[in-house]
Amino acid sequence: MAESHLQSSLITASQFFEIWLHFDADGSGYLEGKELQNLIQELLQARKKAGLELSPEMKSFVDQYGQRDDGKIGIVELAHVLPTEENFLLLFRCQQLKSCEEFMKTWRKYDTDHSGFIETEELKNFLKDLLEKANKTVDDTKLAEYTDLMLKLFDSNNDGKLELTEMARLLPVQENFLLKFQGIKMCGKEFNKAFELYDQDGNGYIDENELDALLKDLCEKNKQELDINNITTYKKNIMALSDGGKLYRTDLALILSAGDN
């Protein structure tokens, strides 16, 4: 199935989804190591079998990752390599998603009920807005199809809604600073204790200075994952979730809490 799709001159959104599932064997949401090498091998074989030249994007991709064991790509990168239908590809090219800070602001806008999730209707509005910003419109049937596919692509725990970390896979890997925090998330009890410790004036939210102190301590304790030289960037991205400079417990929990007690 994946081979025949890779031979196509134009890949539909549904075919793209099938290709991704085929190669993301461990369901991590990223292609790395053997998964990435399998994709490259099958892509080369499929194009040769179909008598098709590699596109410039494919050639650049093969040159960049073909000889590397440490390569890692997400859905965004693959969407730029394969000849995907235009409107679906636009969802991965939006200016709003070029930086983590803009992504956080977009999240805040569409998580309208502040639940910490974007649910189906919110996701549909999000995608519709992205397409409109690119001066593209799709009918309701196509929009529903894209929404369904996005859920299938990004909803790693299959709960029918997207968490911040799931939605962040719309960002290119190098822009996704949330990946840095995946390995240092705290259980619910630890997170609440930390929040109360750094909310020094006890007003129920953390301001920029209090967040700065928290991040410095996290960097000191987790030097492998976090770089203290990037604190300004971390802070700017996280504060984009705040409400007028006030970072409430539920907002910070999206970044630092694993949710368990």
Swiss-Prot record:
Ca(2+) 4 binds at D199, D201, N203, Y205, E210. GO terms for biological process: cochlea development; locomotory behavior; long-term memory; metanephric collecting duct development; metanephric connecting tubule development; metanephric distal convoluted tubule development; metanephric part of ureteric bud development; regulation of synaptic plasticity. The modification N-acetylalanine is found at A2. Ca(2+) 3 binds at D155, N157, D159, K161, E166. InterPro entries: Calbindin_Ca-bind (IPR051001), EF-hand-dom_pair (IPR011992), EF_Hand_1_Ca_BS (IPR018247), EF_hand_dom (IPR002048). Residues 2-7 are annotated as: Interaction with RANBP9. One of its GO terms (molecular function) is vitamin D binding. Keywords: Acetylation, Calcium, Metal-binding, Repeat, Vitamin D. PROSITE patterns: EF_HAND_1 (PS00018), EF_HAND_2 (PS50222). One of its GO terms (cellular component) is cytoplasm. Ca(2+) 2 binds at D111, D113, S115, E122. Expressed in the modiolar nerve root and in bushy neurons in the ventral cochlear nucleus (at protein level). Ca(2+) 1 binds at D24, D26, S28, Y30, E35. Belongs to the calbindin family. Buffers cytosolic calcium. May stimulate a membrane Ca(2+)-ATPase and a 3',5'-cyclic nucleotide phosphodiesterase. This is Calbindin. It comes from Mus musculus (Mouse). The lineage of its organism: Eukaryota, Metazoa, Chordata, Craniata, Vertebrata. The gene is Calb1.
